[in-house]
């Protein structure tokens, strides 16, 4: 599903690939070390606001095909837009969190049924920060953002 960059939430899921890491200026000696990469990505998030607490979890993985990447579950004390989060992480693929704590924890750790792609989980940190998704009533804000971007009510 495609989400508007103006979509507002307090919780997001991001997939960070090497291209995104390079967009952020993270050098290979950092991003090739799963523990350093996870710490760097979570530091970027936690330091991105001086007024609210931002926490998260990170799993660094390698796909069966050899694609090295990281999954992030990100939480903010205030709402922010999907576009802001994606930009903060080098234009990484970002979506709002829609599932609960158990489902997202299982996804991050690639437990069944999320192990179907045969990814190797190289490092995980921050699982205690994963929260249950709590719906918000920002639907009108999200609809307004879509209309502002030129979408019609039927779309």
Question: Could you tell me what each predicted segment is?
Answer:
Residues 1-47, 77-155:
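Catalytic "initiation/cleavage/transfer" segments centered on a nucleophilic residue
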Residues 50-65:
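Short, glycine- and small/hydrophobic-rich beta-strand elements in well-ordered beta-sheets
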Residues 68-76:
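A generic structural motif
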